[in-house]
Amino acid sequence: MAVAGAMVMSGALLLLHLLAFTCVACNGGSELPPISRRSFPKGFIFGTSSSSYQFEGGAVLGGRGPSIWDTFTHQSPDKITDRSNGDVACDSYHLYKEDVRSMKEMGMDAYRFSISWSRILPSALSGGVNREGISYYNNLINELLSKGVQPFVTLFHWDSPQALEDKYKGFLSPNIINDYKEYAETCFKEFGDRVKHWITFNEPWTFCSMGYASGIMAPGRCSSWEVGKCRVGDSGREPYTACHHQLLAHAETVRLYKEKYQALQKGKIGIILNADWFVPLSQSKSSSDAARRALDFMLGWFMDPLIRGDYPLSMRELVGNRLPEFSKEQSGMVKGAFDFIGLNYYTSSYADNDPPSHGHNNSYNTDAHAKITGSRNGIPIGPQAASFWFHIYPEGICEMLLYVKENYGNPTIYITENGVDEVNNKTMPLEEALKDDTRIEYYHKHLLALLSAMRDGANVKGYFAWSLLDNFEWAEGYTVRFGINFVDYDDGMKRYPKNSARWFKKFLQKSNRDGNKRLKRVAYNAFSN
């Protein structure tokens, strides 16, 4: 077994190097080849994404109970760059019809949004279903369908009810598994006749690493010496516990849906994972090993259990008894528990070996022994976006998709988030704020890279831009803007299409499919040797 494991690892490391030659970006300064809806296979889905806390507002309206993000932003405003919150956000709670009309006008096929758990069940099922919350989502779903837009529904996008956090510390307790399953079943019963794509969890990596290791996002738990300087938490154990319970809740819910609802409702169910790409800092084996470990600790943390029934070997070896174990029954339940995988891709980084130091504190953030950086020899991996963590690297989406294809059996994939931010410059005239040519270039290059991966066999069925609107961007508040539509937070949340929204409208125009093969070939050549 040791020899077999070494051979698998060696093959995976070789793949990291091969992918670097497969996905080569367009040279800067050259004109980008044309691309449109016609470049993609028939039936390929295009849409935009959002989440309840970032978009809805209506925090105390319609019977909604507080979520952990309400508590976090109000009790720890210093952890939000501009000390803001999502009490109003984009006010999609009131303006959803306008937003759906915008999607229709752009020609979007689908809209991925999340349901606020605390708007449906302010506590647990025993506390009763909030019918006003059910009505809001019924209205949204019906409005989407009336305009020909498919709903892709995320059940959990980081905003669990504060009542469950108070009752048993939320995802740190196995009690959350049944409460989550009851919440999901409520949604299947109420909306499943019209919703054909369900997502159980969005980015468990972000929720667990930022919420329980760094402490910079809700519920704001970490060891006292970590960056979040939290009052309570254990950065070496709690991230693994919380995500273990999310995986089990996911698997239980998928089993429930498949056994009880899928045949009748004819929908599909999956999960969304982060998909940053990591490039070895140097040609050394230690850098390649570090890049693989970084992938294991981000993507493999979830893909390995979903495909193989257990955590990656690197995690089991490095984390030891701080990493929960699956029972035989749990392993069998988690393995294969999906119809599709959603991947959110934004950026890539370099990875280098970071040797352990004696007597260091245990933390998820250092367990991979990988030093992550955005530059090599002072040269960034790609242009800097507005956020400090964000470098633009289109090749990464291609490399990640081919890595998933080769390592995880080429599952059905949707790119469920992809986009870039700009600084929210409050002094900039509106006319100038709508000129987001960098975003257009970002989408153009990433869609070309996506086509390249599909040309090489990646099983991708759809693409969702982040995001429809500027919105509350978690720890960064309203200091950055990700939207293809501008939101004027100071003037009634008025929406204005940016140039990127107009670009998407042109990109999505439905016409005859002549030239499809030519466009595919041009796009492929732009990202290959």
Curated annotation (Swiss-Prot):
Superkingdom as given in the UniProt entry: Eukaryota
Catalysis: reaction(s): Hydrolysis of terminal, non-reducing beta-D-glucosyl residues with release of beta-D-glucose
Organism: Oryza sativa subsp. japonica
InterPro entries membership: Glyco_hydro_1, Glyco_hydro_1_N_CS, Glycoside_hydrolase_SF
Signal peptide: 1-25
Pfam families: Glyco_hydro_1
Keyword line: Disulfide bond, Glycoprotein, Glycosidase, Hydrolase, Signal
Binding locations of a beta-D-glucoside: 54, 157, 202-203, 346, 417, 466, 473-474, 482
Catalytic center residues: 203 (proton donor), 417 (nucleophile)
Keyword Transit peptide belongs to the record: no
Keyword Signal appears in the UniProt entry: yes
One Gene Ontology term of the molecular function aspect: beta-galactosidase activity
EC number: 3.2.1.21
Family per similarity comment: Belongs to the glycosyl hydrolase 1 family.
Sugar-bearing residue positions: 361, 425
GO biological process: carbohydrate metabolic process
Name listed for the protein in its UniProt record: Beta-glucosidase 11
Residues that span the membrane, as ranges: none
SS bond partners: 222-230
